[in-house]
Design a protein with these regions (language model features):
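Extended, compositionally biased flexible segments
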Residues: 1-101
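Catalytic-pocket segment enriched in acidic/His residues
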Residues: 2-21, 33, 37-46, 105, ...
Length: 227
């Protein structure tokens, strides 16, 4: 068999302490999973549970640079804990969900906020705001076997040395296992899936030249420069 044209490259992430790479299949994202962030975005976390959307695997950015995208004048940072799956399935039981996690990483859900506001008013999907090129800078993956499954610990993001986002993983409305279990009732999960678990309050705009430093306690640090 021959391909009609060369197949697309397989997006991967490095694994700490290994020469192996983690092949990425899909990137799922959780919205409104920290109450204070839901409020700052104009939603009631007690009435509106988190929901899911996707980025494309080729949205990964691993160069340490985030190219400021076109068609926008208002790009925001959102720091997140990322869960990387090595096992999949459907209707996964909550008490077995964490057994599917290979490891964790630090990620940024970069967002064209002005475009998001526009499509929200029209009741349309968010892809143009969330799934543009290089919109998902993600760090190396650290094995769950090495650090366990983080359920608490500081999560923060600084821009040019000044803290903008600061929270704790314990503030997540839906915990990682609950996210996996619920998501598996909507989609068939598979090895290579990434789940971005939501962002704490303090999101804000970035500009060319900004240096972003995101940290999740016990997982690692991601440094990105906006170019």
């Amino acid at each position: 068999m021959a391909y009609a044209f060369p197949p697309a490259w397989i997006p991967t992430l490095p694994i700490r302490g290994s020469s192996d790479e983690f092949p990425v299949r899909r990137i799922y994202c959780v919205g409104r999973n920290y109450a204070e962030h839901a409020v700052e975005m104009g939603h009631d976390p007690d009435k509106e549970p988190p929901f899911f959307f996707q980025k494309n695997p080729d949205n990964l950015a691993q160069t340490g640079e985030f190219p400021y995208p076109g068609a926008t004048k208002d790009v925001h940072h959102e720091i997140e804990l990322v869960a990387a799956l090595s096992k999949g399935g459907t209707d996964i039981a909550p008490d077995a969900a964490l057994d599917h996690v290979f490891g964790y990483a630090v990620g940024l859900d970069m967002t064209r906020r002005d475009l998001q506001a526009g499509v929200k008013k029209l009741g349309r999907p968010w892809e143009i705001a969330k799934a543009f090129e290089k919109s998902a800078p993600i760090s190396e993956i650290v094995l769950a076997s090495a650090i366990g499954h983080p359920s608490s610990g500081a999560i923060s993001l600084a821009v040019n040395g000044k803290t903008r986002q600061s929270g704790d993983l314990s503030q997540m409305i839906w915990k990682t296992g609950e996210i996996i279990a619920h998501l598996s009732g909507l989609f068939e999960l598979a090895p290579g899936d990434l789940i971005m678990t939501g962002t704490p309050a303090g999101v804000g705009a970035v500009a060319r030249g900004d240096r972003l430093e995101g940290t999740v306690e016990g997982v690692g640090t991601l440094v990105v420069t906006v170019v």
